[in-house]
Amino acid sequence: MLFKSIGELIPLYALYALLFADHGMSTGQISLLFAIWSATSFLLEVPSGAWADTVSRRGLLALSGVLLTAGFALWTAVPSFAGFAAGFVLWGTSGSLASGTFEALLYDDLAARGESGSYPRVLGYTRAGAEAAVVVAIVAATPLYLYGGYALVGWSSVVIAGAHTLVALSLPTAPKAVSAVDVDDLEDSASEAIAPESVVARPRPFARYLTMLKTGVGEAIRVRAVRYGVLLEALLFGITAFDEYFALLAEESGVSTAVVPLLVGLTVLGSLTGSVLAGRTEGMSGRTMAIAVGGAGVLFLGGAVIAGLATGRPDAVYLLTGVGFGSIGVSYGIVYNAGIVAGARLQDAIEGPARATVTSVSGLLGEVIALAVFGFAALVTLWWSMSTLLALLGASILAIAALTPRWLPRSAEP
């Protein structure tokens, strides 16, 4: 929990959209920066997952922290489009190395202790700790900005990211959770892959990497429960790319800059609540999840519309934005909770040894959806407001709800 929490205790998280805007970036340019970030993750998602099934997962998490630290340092030292873009490439690479790696490491550690059934609850608490850290970071961002501007916010973020890297080195290691049958299957496929080495030598780590990549992607495509689980988790987490526009919605509504982090904080409290409740909702049926996600779509759409009504109404701006962001926060919490449950069900459905690779396939598809969100945002905001954009994205949650009953993997037997 400490590792994930410190990784989210970054003051820049509350202000980077405004940082870009205050340095002359248009909404289209900001969306392009987000797309660069997502595209980097997209290109590296599955290969990094296969790497995590081959080499030290703890080492990859430490490397991820180093890249994250470098990215924030670049943003602070070179606040321009080029600097922001390069920082996002580093951050995207960092995220790809960590995506699936931490979850697989956690699951394997619990499996080694005979407590794999606790995975949904532990993962929920871990993410709740991370969301709580975001709340603290949001609260800290305002005084840091008032005292030292974006420079102090940026360098504070660099220091915290460095501490996150050091914590990664203290994480436990555990044997990968593989059954005897899976080991035999892996050895057979590895033998076929390595056989040609009598003619052309190939480094063993690379052969293992290819084997894990093939095994993980193959399971994600071939096994129905895994395939649907991958798709559902990707949809639920990919659609949350809309959170990158919350600060811009608040700014468009007409509130003061000092209030923007507080409104964004309402949405973070929503996701925090969703994380905490994941242990209680882990056994929900697909039908129940569909109803919850459908309700979240209605709340999100309504909240975006209400916040949009605040524009040009200084007498009611804080009332309308408070109600609007409160509704969005509740919706965000429901969607976030559903994403955690779907991710836990996916982990239970995975039977092969390439757990991190399969998880990364879901992450890859999530990045594809995020890219679609960013592209959609860049186009929509050419003609319509930010509130209209978010209302349309809220409507898409309703479509996800319709798919949930069929795609949610069954709960593992107790």
Regions picked out by a protein language model, each given a short descriptive name:
Residues 5, 71, 82-98, 234, ...:
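Hydrophobic core of transmembrane alpha-helices in multi-pass small-molecule transporters
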Residues 13, 19, 218-273:
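A single, central transmembrane helix in multi-pass transporters
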Residues 22, 134-157, 251-253, 370-393:
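Transmembrane alpha-helix termini and helix-breaking/packing motifs in multi-pass membrane transporters
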Residues 24, 56, 77-82, 306-310:
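Helix-breaking motifs and short loop linkers at transmembrane-helix boundaries and internal kinks
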Residues 31-33, 42-50, 57-61, 253-414:
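C-terminal transmembrane bundle of multi-pass solute transporters/carriers
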Residues 88-131:
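Cytoplasmic helix-loop-helix junction between adjacent transmembrane helices
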Residues 109, 157-187, 200, 406-414:
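Helix-loop junctions on the cytosolic side of multi-pass membrane transporters
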Residues 171-231:
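Juxtamembrane intracellular "pre-TM" segments in multi-pass secondary transporters
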